[in-house]
Amino acid sequence: KATLNDLLSRLRELNQRKAALPTLWPTNGGTITSYFGGRSDPFGNRSYDWHPGVDIANDYGAPVYASASGTIEEAGWVSGYGRYVRIQHGYGYETAYGHMSKLAVQAGQSVSKGDVIGYVGSSGYSTGPHVHFEVLVNGQTTDPLELVR
């Protein structure tokens, strides 16, 4: 028979799992300019390019939000992605954000869903102001639109 403490412990666990699920759109509004999956290379270097996330165009300097609570695993410059943040959310979930103009977090920092982690930019391999947003489940990229609406 479950005790009150058992039930409270289970409720805390469920709330932690819910907070780890990347369901928050990472910008206020914006327009998807490139979807997850195969696409033409936007720079014309190849006829086919695999795109592991979605690109969300927005105003330069608009805030970028953590899609779920977690720990900043990486924050800095990454080739191609420019100013980049990767968040470990637990339960197999990670998110990554690229091309930002400025970062607002550091590696090792804890963030809550909705915290500002950076600002929309065009750093790295980019054609204009946007944030590249990736969701990984157990290390595999997945279409962010399956979780975030």
PLM segments and residue spans:
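Catalytic cores of peptidoglycan-degrading enzymes
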Residues: 22-149
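Non-catalytic extracellular/periplasmic "stalk"
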Residues: 1-27
